[in-house]
A protein has these predicted regions:
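Short catalytic micro-motifs in class I SAM-dependent methyltransferases
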Residues: 115-119
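Class I (Rossmann-like) S-adenosyl-L-methionine-dependent methyltransferase catalytic domain
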Residues: 1-106, 120-136, 142-206
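Conserved acidic residues
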Residues: 109
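A conserved beta-strand element that flanks and buttresses the S-adenosyl-L-methionine
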Residues: 112
Length: 206
């Protein structure tokens, strides 16, 4: 089983309540502050990669954002988010797809990923993801990528991860991406454990 295994994630999202997964956040404060940092506007096209049942989409809709897409490998995760939002779910675009093979249908201003990329432990999978990033993010746009930090957990949801910092992501993303912010975050799980995250924000310049 790998982090790119759809069955694993469907099982997670159908067997556990929203607040029973380690990555649950009532409000994604770091992501929201970084969106503010990069000057996100309500009409910006934003894609949340591996968004699952995250509440980021709720917060963006609350703030008046009108072009929000949520991509996840697990249709069950997206269904959970849609059920939570009810009628409001129609205001977002829901994409059940693999970030390594998905063909972005438009050019996004902001590419957000909290804890999806770090599940890609294979160099080929990482490169496939970066190819989609290159196809999907507009030049001048921003990529906000949250991963476990170098001193963070080695596994999540029972699966191995690759821990990153801004330097390791820069090497993978290439010279077309410039770091504009790098910060650590101690995420507290619903049961009180602390997971060390690293959020790296890039501006695409080429």
């Amino acid at each position: 089983v790998s982090g790119s295994d759809q069955t694993h994630w469907d099982d997670v999202y159908t067997s556990k309540a929203e607040a029973e997964v380690s990555w649950f956040q009532e409000e994604p404060e770091v992501s929201l502050s970084l969106l503010e940092l990069v000057g996100a506007r309500p009409d910006d096209a934003i894609v949340d990669i591996g968004g699952g049942a995250s509440r980021l989409v709720d917060c963006l809709l609350d703030k008046g954002f009108t072009r929000v897409s949520v991509l996840d490998l697990s249709a069950a995760a997206l269904a959970a988010a849609q059920a939570r939002l009810g009628e409001r779910a129609k205001a977002a675009n829901w994409i059940a797809a693999d970030a390594r093979s998905w063909e972005p249908p438009e050019s996004y201003d902001i590419w957000h990923d909290r804890a999806a990329f770090h599940f890609l432990t294979d160099a080929g999978d990482q490169q496939a993801y970066v190819e989609r990033l290159n196809r999907g993010l507009a030049v001048g746009g921003h990529a906000i990528v949250g991963t476990f930090a170098p001193d963070g957990p080695e596994k999540c949801s029972g699966l191995p991860v690759v821990r990153h910092d801004a330097d390791s992501l820069s090497r993978l993303f290439g010279p077309g991406y410039v770091v504009v912010d790098s910060r650590r975050h101690a995420h507290k799980t619903p049961w009180g454990a602390v997971q060390k995250f690293q959020f790296s924000t890039f501006r695409r310049v080429a």
